[in-house]
Amino acid sequence: MAAALADMADLEELSRLSPLSPGSPGPAARGRAEPPEEEEEEDDEEAEAEAVAALLLNGGAGGGAGGGEAETMSEPSPESASQAGGDEDEDEEDDEDEGSSSGGAEEESSAESLVGSSSGGCSGDETRSLSPGAASSSSGDGDGKEGLEEPKGPRGGPGGPGSSGGGSSSSSVVSSGGDEGYGTGGGGSSATSGGRRGSLEMSSDGEPLSRMDSEDSISSTLMDIDSTISSGRSTPAMMNGQGSTTASSKHIAYNCCWDQCQACFNSSPDLADHIRSIHVDGQRGGVFVCLWKGCKVYNTPSTSQSWLQRHMLTHSGDKPFKCVVGGCNASFASQGGLARHVPTHFSQQNSSKVSSQPKAKEESPSKAGMNKRRKLKNKRRRSLPRPHDFFDAQTLDAIRHRAICFNLSAHIESLGKGHSVVFHSTVIAKRKEESGKIKLLLHWMPEDILPDVWVNESERHQLKTKVVHLSKLPKDTALLLDPNIYRTMPQKRLKRFDILNFPR
């Protein structure tokens, strides 16, 4: 019986706390015409009837499965959205009336807990509000503020946002026209504007957030992530191994490509020292070869070790000979290249001192440039061509006449085939020896070329003529034939002339 009486008392309190009907005037409007005590009694009676009807309609809907959203089908009216705050005197009278009622504040808190448990449970059915125009009830604070306050009491259900506050005179339910509704208590007043649909979400720490706030926070978080990635800073995902923005440092390795050698070094001087000490100095026997893979002189024997040492510098890329002039970072693979480079600094200094003269072109240290300068120097030494040519027709006739006379005397062209001189003999003397033989003294024409000779009388017929090659003539007497036979010429050209004109 005690439990039944307690339930009846809870139902009475629940009916008294239920919202007003749409047609009933607000408590602020009635307060001007009726005394506060009569107003409270009428409100209690109407609330009891509406609460009983709501419990009969909803039944066990409040105890359904948790996790859903309680939706109200009624749209809030502008009249009910405005909350009428009473004066401080009316609040005190309400508190006295509530204190004198059966059950007191404890029964009110139990009734509010029942409301929170019945409305906070998650159900798939839609809950129809009996008072579609009522969106909020009057609060006991008396400050008349509108809006939502953070819940100060524990939440009503596991999935519902309804909460009950001890000592509060009413609990309000905010209907948002099909969106999620959150009822807040704890002495605070709540109201929603006419056409606005506000949805709330739960933050990470359990506090409700509006949808607009949550979207802004998500977009700002994404922008922070993008800026972090673009700036190259490490994020927690990168620290966990999901990403990496650190660039690997570039490292150049110098590999030895000598046959059957796989050594690797960090710099070209180290590679050059390795080649010189292991592969070059290690060769014995007087024969030196390059066994570098892909070399154009691969395995070509050489007798010069210094050549192999200079050649290996092309493979190692080392340039040990650096310029001694301050401020110059040039380096060379050979000492000769360094020797040709150093004078260019001083030639530039000398040319800069002479400002009036144009800047001289820098001499190239290459062999091609040196050969070109040598050729130009030799060309200047040669005599300039004569402006007048004295080889005219008269000179040509004189040369032709001398050639004809020479041919008549020597018969080079007619009988000697162009390379031999034909001599004719005449008897200038005759003698008889003791043995009885007769000898003749022959004189050769042209004169003064061949000496006179004594021959037997029987040989006279054979020695009427004698053919002698120009190369076999005595040089001291051959010039008597013609000065041009043995003219002065370079030794190389003379030998070539003899080979071409006097083949043996």
Swiss-Prot record:
Basic and acidic residues: compositionally biased ranges: 142-153
Biased composition range(s): Gly residues: 59-69, 154-168, 178-189
Protein name per the record: Zinc finger protein AEBP2
PROSITE patterns the record matches: ZINC_FINGER_C2H2_1, ZINC_FINGER_C2H2_2
Lineage of producing organism: Eukaryota, Metazoa, Chordata, Craniata, Vertebrata
Tissues where this protein is expressed: Expressed in brain, brown adipose tissue, white adipose tissue, heart, kidney, lung, skeletal muscle, small intestine and spleen. Expressed at low levels in liver.
Keywords on record: Acetylation, Chromatin regulator, DNA-binding, Metal-binding, Nucleus, Phosphoprotein, Repeat, Repressor, Transcription, Transcription regulation, Zinc, Zinc-finger
Chief location: nucleus
Interaction with SUZ12, as annotated region: 400-471
Cellular component per GO, a single term: ESC/E(Z) complex
